[in-house]
């Protein structure tokens, strides 16, 4: 089996070449050389210099070589690894631009020639694109080349009949929000620097995201392109990227079987064990026997009339999919709440303000109450609805049009989701984690809003059954790529207190999962974790992994080194890995046993029996909480 890794074959050194031109200003001289050679030249008061890999290299134009002076330097990778990595990236960028590729931020290279128009909209072209990333594995450097597609307008922005939210500048590689293109004048949004009229509009093309593909009706075709043509992107690497042969071995990285790990995930239900989560309908919830209370909320009597046939088929017919699923999952009884005065099972809400009738009635009720809210239209922002409904209700909004033609698997998913939100219910137990009841898993996400110049910190704690022990979020912190460790310490103490209150003792092991890298002082973090002398492990989780293969890796884990792994979750869409790096491990588990637990956390909770989470559950929780204000409450079963 092969991975898209190509070993760097040149010496791990950087060569610094110096140039002196007494007839030219150094800044201007450096700028001209950078433009002509497609690589950055630096300047000082009197000198210009270039940093390149330690290979034979001649600058353009040839006569400029006469300005080269004898002074040069060789800097080894061990002396300055950051310089070596930056230099490799810059040289790769030059080679791509020299060979008819656009550069796009994030080390993406868009083929100018390898493109084709979409069948569903010929004004949009799919360009074969390669994303490049360097990896250091067991002291050797590799370039990872990941094929993908970029969707650009066929013509420059001012000539394009189709427009999108963002413009891509083919010269700078940057994207900008599109403002207008009237009377031959193209305007873009520069954020804090305001709106600008561009000087060279021919350099700007519309860039279409997956969301815009939905808007314009070609999202299905994009999915098919990835499904049917991404394989050819891998096959073209050797032929298309021949120009990189001077620095890399263009043969793929051969993955030996001892580097492949398979974790057998088994679900234990009440009446059986299976590797398939869908067998929950066959074997019933691991723990249930709960009554389920349901309240229906409608926007108007007209709405009730329009969907009454669908409601009767679903909720009055005892042989319906709804009742069948209720009993399959082990619920003991269904109770439809009624309005106290009228005895009606229809409760009303205002579709404009989302105020509900009988709010006091619901606030005084105890137990698990599912609120099925029928919506007339899609709500772009559902926070207002969540704010107005009592906090003790478990909200299940559904569009009226979907209820009228609802599929059986959707009904089953709704019932399953209800069980997920009831604390007394346990759909299943992951057998790999069943004996880890004294281990606590903490997820941390630090996200940034560069426009507002603020950071948000979210932290969760989850046990081996997927129960959320603790969840909190800090909004609008001072923008910083590092976590505020005073907050982390305070939250850690809160988590331990919550755990102790539930279990009357502290956990024996804590595994801390960080979305991204630990940029903070690790020693301080270790001191925080040592408060109660609990054994711990620190793990970095990178969800933007470039390493992949044209072969099927789903449900496999790749061992890159003793502490570095990539797992490929089972998904219905494109194969994409998640990198796990174990930074610190002072638990009694070895690294592979830690990895097994982390991977099992992707299955410890399923949002529906038809969907897997891609990230370990503690991070899935904080990612959702960090990205939304209140909407996460519809998906994350945490009622505090």
Swiss-Prot record:
InterPro entries: Ago_MID_bact, Ago_N_bact, Piwi, RNaseH-like_sf, RNaseH_sf. Residues 424-640 are annotated as: PIWI domain. The active site is at 445, 481, 515, 623. Residues 101-153 are annotated as: Linker L1. Mn(2+) 1 binds at residues 445, 515. Its EC number is 3.1.24.-, 3.1.26.-. GO terms for molecular function: DNA binding; DNA endonuclease activity; metal ion binding; RNA binding; RNA endonuclease activity. The keyword RNA-binding applies. Residues 1-100 are annotated as: N-terminal domain. Residues 154-209 are annotated as: PAZ domain. Its cofactor is Mn(2+). Keywords: DNA-binding, Endonuclease, Hydrolase, Manganese, Metal-binding, Nuclease, RNA-binding. Signal peptide: none annotated. Optimum temperature for all combinations of guide:target is 60-65 degrees Celsius, the RNA product is more stable at 60 than 65 degrees Celsius. Residues 210-291 are annotated as: Linker L2. It holds the Pfam family MpAgo_N-like. Residues 292-423 are annotated as: Mid domain. It is an enzyme of class 3 (hydrolase). Has 4 domains (N-terminal, PAZ, Mid and PIWI). The N-terminal and PAZ domains are joined by linker L1, the PAZ and Mid domains are joined by linker L2. The domains assemble in 2 lobes; the PAZ lobe consists of the N-terminal, L1, PAZ and L2 domains, while the PIWI lobe has the Mid and PIWI domains. The PIWI domain assumes an RNase H fold and has the catalytic residues. gDNA lies between the 2 lobes, with its unpaired 5'-end anchored in the Mid lobe. Belongs to the argonaute family. Long pAgo subfamily. This is Protein argonaute. It comes from Marinitoga hydrogenitolerans (strain DSM 16785 / JCM 12826 / AT1271).
């Amino acid at each position: 089996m092969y991975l898209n890794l190509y070993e760097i074959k040149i010496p791990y050194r950087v060569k610094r070449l110096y140039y002196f031109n007494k007839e030219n200003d150094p800044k201007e001289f450096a700028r001209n050389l950078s433009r002509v050679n497609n690589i950055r030249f630096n300047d000082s008061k009197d000198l210009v210099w270039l940093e390149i890999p330690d290979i034979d290299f001649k600058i353009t134009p040839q006569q400029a070589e006469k300005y080269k002076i004898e002074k040069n330097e060789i800097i080894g990778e061990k002396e300055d690894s950051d310089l070596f990595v930056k230099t490799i990236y810059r040289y790769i960028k030059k080679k791509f631009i020299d060979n008819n590729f656009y550069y796009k931020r994030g080390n993406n290279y868009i083929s100018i020639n390898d493109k084709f128009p979409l069948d569903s909209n010929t004004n949009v072209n799919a360009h074969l694109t390669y994303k490049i990333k360097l990896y250091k594995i067991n002291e050797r450097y590799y370039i990872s080349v990941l094929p993908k597609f970029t969707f650009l307008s066929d013509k420059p922005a001012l000539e394009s009949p189709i427009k999108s939210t963002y413009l891509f500048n083919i010269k700078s590689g940057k994207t900008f929000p599109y403002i207008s293109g009237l009377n031959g004048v193209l305007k873009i949004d520069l954020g804090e620097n305001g709106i600008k009229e561009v000087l060279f509009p021919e350099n700007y093309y519309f860039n279409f995201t997956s969301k815009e593909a939905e808007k314009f009706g070609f999202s299905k075709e994009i999915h098919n392109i990835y499904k049917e043509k991404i394989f050819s992107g891998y096959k073209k690497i050797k032929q298309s990227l021949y120009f990189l042969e001077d620095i890399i071995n263009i043969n793929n990285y051969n993955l030996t079987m001892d580097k492949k790990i398979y974790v057998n995930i088994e679900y234990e239900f009440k009446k059986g064990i299976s590797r398939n989560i869908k067998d929950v309908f066959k074997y019933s919830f691991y723990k249930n026997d709960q009554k389920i209370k349901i309240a229906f909320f409608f926007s108007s009597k007209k709405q009730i009339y329009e969907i009454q046939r669908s409601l009767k088929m679903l909720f009055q017919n005892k042989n319906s999919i709804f009742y069948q699923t209720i009993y399959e999952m082990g619920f003991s009884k269904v109770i439809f709440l009624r309005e106290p005065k009228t005895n009606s099972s229809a409760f009303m809400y205002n579709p404009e303000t989302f105020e509900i009738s009988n709010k006091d009635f619901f606030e005084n009720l105890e137990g698990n109450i599912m609120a099925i809210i029928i919506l007339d239209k899609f709500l772009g922002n559902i926070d207002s609805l969540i704010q107005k409904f009592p906090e003790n209700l478990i909200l299940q909004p559904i569009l009226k049009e979907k209820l009228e033609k609802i599929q059986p698997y959707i009904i089953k998913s709704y019932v399953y989701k209800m069980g997920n939100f009831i604390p007394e219910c346990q759909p299943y137990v992951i057998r790999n984690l069943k004996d880890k009841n004294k281990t606590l898993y903490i997820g941390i996400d630090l996200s940034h809003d560069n426009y507002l110049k603020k950071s948000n910190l979210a932290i969760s704690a989850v046990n081996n059954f997927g129960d959320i022990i603790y969840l909190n979020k800090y909004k609008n912190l001072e923008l910083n790529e590092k976590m505020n460790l005073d907050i982390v310490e305070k939250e850690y103490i809160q988590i331990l207190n919550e755990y102790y209150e539930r279990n009357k003792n502290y956990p024996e092991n804590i595994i801390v999962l960080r979305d991204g890298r630990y940029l903070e002082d690790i020693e301080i973090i270790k001191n925080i974790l040592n408060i109660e002398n609990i054994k711990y492990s620190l793990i970095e989780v990178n969800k933007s992994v470039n390493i992949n293969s044209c072969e099927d890796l789903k449900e496999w884990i790749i061992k890159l080194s003793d502490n570095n792994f990539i797992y490929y979750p089972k998904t219905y869409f494109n194969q994409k890995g998640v990198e796990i790096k174990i930074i610190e491990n002072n638990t009694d588990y070895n690294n592979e046993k830690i990895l097994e637990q982390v991977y099992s956390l992707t299955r410890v909770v399923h949002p529906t029996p038809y969907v897997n989470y891609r990230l370990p559950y503690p991070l899935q929780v904080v990612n959702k909480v960090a990205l939304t204000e209140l909407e996460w409450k519809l998906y994350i079963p945490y009622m505090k």
